[in-house]
Structures are given as structure tokens and as C-alpha cells.
Regions:
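Short, structured coil segments at secondary-structure junctions
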Residues: 94, 159-161, 248-249, 309
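Flexible, glycine-rich surface segments
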Residues: 208-293
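Extracytoplasmic substrate-binding proteins
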Residues: 120, 131, 137-231, 255-256, ...
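Bacterial Sec-dependent N-terminal signal peptides
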Residues: 1-23
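Bacterial Sec-exported substrate-binding components of ABC uptake systems
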Residues: 16-86, 193-223, 289, 296, ...
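A ligand-binding cleft/hinge motif common to bilobed small-molecule-binding domains
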Residues: 148-158, 284-296
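Short glycine/proline-rich, acidic loop/turn segments that cap or connect secondary-structure elements
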Residues: 300-316
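A short, structured surface patch at a secondary-structure boundary
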Residues: 54-63, 70-148
Length: 359
């Protein structure tokens, strides 16, 4: 039985194959599942064994983005709009019922890639746009979507397609992103399995972070970001990237900044603040050899930075690694990669999974 009804912002959306259970507000709460690291969801199990899932707006906390009433049930088909949803689906052994994904051309996971190539999983996007006809044609029982696009989602809900808004990518910590598997665990009726997966990730991540605390003597300075149109875009100090750098034993140059979005600076400020940083980190999407011109995006001024001169540039190439997929459940591997960059004495024989030094 598919039962989903959601309060999204200021309006109510209903989607159900069978009528939703009534009077949920009058049901007692048996237990509350509060994430340890994630800030974007809270789950309550009610006295009738259904769940009330509250999804929070991570860009406007503590506002509620969506509230779902969920009954444990057998799902026959699911879909997702982001490649970052796929690792959660795979880890909980739900790939056999996956019928569609967004941005299928960017999928790197070999098992999902093979399903797409065989025509078993449809591409639900055209360019950067949602293909509504494909969604209706696929008609999944449940679809994991981005935390925006309310008008389209209302149409899907009216057609009986349950929509759950997933915003793991807005979490400010690596473990916060990974902990969203616990939400998927409730939806797939695999709560214990999801908790076990997350606890293993948490233990591995914290073990790596503790190695830095006990072994690293110094913390090299680090900057990151990209240059576009005369401005430098960098994550703030309260971000996923900053937390990863700090946990790896680096000192992020803007660690004290607090912002709900990227920091945007003119190049002249970066020239002052980051010119002498020990390391420069980047997320890139490049096929083929990474040249100095590609790395600096054609701006020769960057070649004068200390990090460039000493070849202390590290990067993750999203064209060659599953950074926009499996990495969400492998923060411990990303952390290990960065530790090997900043403190090679700790990981002397390290094989990078995501981040590596520019050679």
C-alpha cells in the first residue's frame, strides 16, 4: 500500500494509491529518530507503526520543507532525480526496482550504468530540465526529488507518484550527508540495515580523523574554490568542504566565515588571502590529462601562487571518480585522500579514491 501525503511549504499535497490514514495528529509518538549529524530530517514512529517524517529546509532552518506520513510497505518501482540518491538505493539493495534516474549520462556506478545501457532505467532529464513525460511514463511508486520544483511535484502527486524531497547535498558535514541513508532505510523498511551501514561509515571516518589528531604535528593552510567572471567562489567555513579539510588536518583559510551560500570575492582578495597558502584544492570535471592551463582556467596569475609553484595542488576529477554518486557514502575515503595529501607521513602507501595531488 502506497501512502504518502506531504505538507510542502504553505500548501498540502496528497498522493496515494489507497487513502491515507486519518487523524495522524492524534496518534502518540512511540519513538523519535534524531540524526546525530544530519540536520535535514527528523523521523517519528507513531503508535500505529507508521512514520511521520519531517524534512527541514536546510537553507532556512528551522523551516519545514515537507512532512510525510509513511506506512511500511512493498514498493514495486522507484526513481530518483539526482545521481547522489543512487548510493543510498544501492546500499539498501533496491536497484532491482529502480526505473528511472536524472542525469543518467553522469552515472559512473558500473551496475547502474549497465542498467541504463540495457534500457532498464530511464533518463528522467533532458539537459538540466526535468522530463515530465518520462516521469509519467515510468510512473514509479516513489520518486526521490530535489528540494525545489513544487509545481511539477504537485502534478506527480496528483498522478499517484509519491515524491520525497532529498537535500543531503546541503548538509554541512560529510557524516551529515551520509546519514541520510537512515531516512532511506525507513522508506525501504530496512532501518536496521541502514543504521548498520551508517555506523560503519561513522566509525571509519572518526578513526581517520583521530589519526590526524594524534599524529599530525602541523596544520597546513588550504584554500579552494573556482574563478569565474572576475570573481572567486569559495565554500564558507560552515560547509562540507571546510569540515573535510579541517578533519583531514588542514587549516581552511576561511574557516571562520559563516554563510548560507558560497563566498564570492574579487580576485584581488584571493591574491591577498590565499597567495601563500600551502595547498589549493579543486573539484574539476576534465577528461584527459590535467594541464596547468586547465587547472588555472587560463588565468596565468594563479601560477604565481605558492601552492601552484610547489605543485601542492590537489583535486577530485568528477569525470573519472564517482564524486557525484558513491562519494556521499564514502566520506571516510575522501578524508583518507586529503590526509594523504596534507600529511603523507600518516598514509605513506595510500591509493587515492577521490582526491589526489597534481603531479
Amino acid at each position: 500500500m502506497i501512502v504518502v501525503y506531504a505538507l510542502c511549504l504553505s500548501f498540502v499535497l496528497f498522493s496515494c494509491i489507497e487513502p491515507p490514514v486519518k487523524n495522524a495528529a492524534n496518534l502518540a509518538v512511540k519513538r523519535t529518530i534524531r540524526p546525530e549529524f544530519a540536520e535535514g530530517f527528523v523521523i517519528e514512529e507513531l503508535s500505529d507503526s507508521s512514520f511521520r517524517i519531517t524534512l527541514l529546509n536546510l537553507e532556512k532552518l528551522p523551516d519545514t520543507l515537507q512532512q510525510i506520513r509513511w506506512k511500511p510497505q512493498t514498493l514495486n518501482s522507484i526513481a530518483c532525480l539526482s545521481t547522489t540518491h543512487l548510493p543510498f538505493i544501492k546500499a539498501l539493495e533496491q536497484l532491482p526496482i529502480l526505473k528511472g534516474t536524472g542525469f543518467s549520462d553522469l552515472v559512473i556506478d558500473p551496475e547502474v550504468r549497465a542498467m541504463i545501457d540495457r534500457g532498464e532505467v530511464a533518463n528522467l532529464t533532458v539537459g538540466h530540465q526535468l522530463d515530465e513525460e518520462k516521469v509519467f511514463g515510468t510512473a514509479p511508486d516513489l520518486m526521490f526529488v530535489y528540494p525545489y520544483g513544487g509545481e511539477a511535484y504537485a502534478k506527480f502527486l496528483d498522478a499517484g507518484i509519491g515524491c520525497v524531497q532529498i537535500s543531503e547535498y546541503l548538509e554541512k558535514s560529510p557524516l551529515g550527508r551520509a546519514e541520510w541513508i537512515r531516512l532511506f532505510g525507513v522508506l525501504f523498511d530496512k532501518e536496521q540495515q541502514a543504521d548498520s551501514v551508517f555506523q560503519n561509515i561513522k566509525s571509519a571516518y572518526q578513526a581517520e580523523a583521530n589519526r590526524v589528531l594524534t599524529s599530525a604535528a602541523e596544520r597546513p593552510t588550504v584554500f579552494t574554490g573556482s574563478y569565474d567572471g572576475g570573481f572567486w567562489y569559495m565554500p564558507p567555513g560552515n560547509s562540507f568542504a571546510a569540515r573535510l579539510i579541517e578533519d583531514a588536518g588542514g587549516h581552511y583559510v576561511y574557516v571562520d566565515s559563516i554563510s548560507s551560500g558560497n563566498l564570492v570575492f574579487p580576485f584581488e582578495k584571493i591574491l591577498t588571502d590565499a597567495h601563500d597558502c600551502d595547498f589549493w584544492g579543486k573539484i574539476i570535471y576534465e577528461k584527459g590529462p590535467l594541464t596547468a592551463e586547465k587547472l588555472t582556467e587560463g588565468d596565468a596569475r594563479l601560477q604565481g601562487f605558492k601552492s601552484f609553484q610547489s605543485r601542492s595542488v590537489f583535486y577530485c576529477n568528477a569525470a573519472e571518480t564517482d564524486y557525484h554518486g558513491q562519494a556521499v557514502l564514502e566520506p571516510h575515503l575522501m578524508l583518507s585522500d586529503m590526509i594523504a595529501v596534507f600529511h603523507p607521513e600518516i598514509h605513506q602507501q595510500h591509493a587515492p579514491a577521490y582526491f589526489r595531488k597534481w603531479e
